[in-house]
Amino acid sequence: TPDDMARLAIGGQRVSADAVEKWKIERGYDKPLFLNVKQEGVKKYTETIFYQRSVPLLTFDFGASDEGRDIGREIKARMWPSLALAVPTFVLGLALSIVFSLVLVFFRTTALDFWGVVVCVVMLSISSLFYIIAGQWLFSKILRLVPYSGFAGGWDTLKFLALPIVVAVIAGLGSEARFLRSLFLEEIGKDYVRTARAKGLSERVVLFKHVLRNALLPILTGAVASLPLLFMGSLISESFFGIPGLGSYTLDALSGQDFSIVRAMVFLGSSLYIVGLIMADISYTLADPRVRFE
């Protein structure tokens, strides 16, 4: 309730009613949630918490946080550190997963394929927190190659982002490679592959030229759908590595009970998710001429 939010923000349960009421008035929480029966006409609906705090989000007017800071300005400032981490992680992770899964498919029914699948299952079974802690222990404490955490501008950004990117790529390799391996194995059983082999093409050419090209359609649509969400950052990685992105911004808002920020980030994430789905449908029609909108 707004009263609980006020007590949490002020600090403590033994807060005077006047202090609680003052906090609610300053932040617009002194009004009813959906319907204000004390008003007349349109004001019954406009003089409410929902209208004044949620409806402006439709025009991407995020307003101010409960501490009085401009949320829109914070999002613009924190968007770039999130992208600096998310874009290389996404590109490198996808490329490495494709190469690794193709190698497993090339050596299918061999010991290499078997142990590769075992490694993938083990990797996807381990929590991402383990990779973060292990990476900080190995590369920062033992080898002293990169800092534990932090962020800086310019070329110094590389040394602060190197460890988070490596950890994120390794953490997602197991699940992505396992999925892509199944996708490539399904393609190998199709008629065009048998036709290519009957023409005398080598297994390497069949796999890397024909199978990969035809399997790129679902990979492309999945990648395009994920692109808008890169702006949202990573909650865990940014918090552990001290990166001032949108992920850590959201997590700090949750821990600080700043529901204005949480509301804005949920709306932004939902909007980007919808944009991603639309982009995936469009890319599907562009990549496959047989598919058309009706």
Positions of PLM-derived features:
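Short, hydrophobic secondary-structure boundary micro-motifs
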Residues: 7, 33-35, 62-66, 132, ...
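An internal, D/E-rich "acidic patch" concept
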Residues: 32-98
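Hydrophobic aliphatic residues
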Residues: 1, 9, 13-14, 27, ...
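Hydrophobic alpha-helical segments of integral membrane proteins
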Residues: 19, 23, 27, 46-62, ...
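Alpha-helical transmembrane segments of integral membrane proteins
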Residues: 79-112, 128, 152-294
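Membrane-water interface segments at the C-terminal ends of transmembrane alpha-helices
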Residues: 1-2, 118-147, 167-172, 178
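Hydrophobic alpha-helical transmembrane segments of membrane transport/permease proteins
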Residues: 1-45, 143-160
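Generic structural marker for isolated residues within well-ordered, non-membrane alpha-helices
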Residues: 6, 20, 119, 136, ...
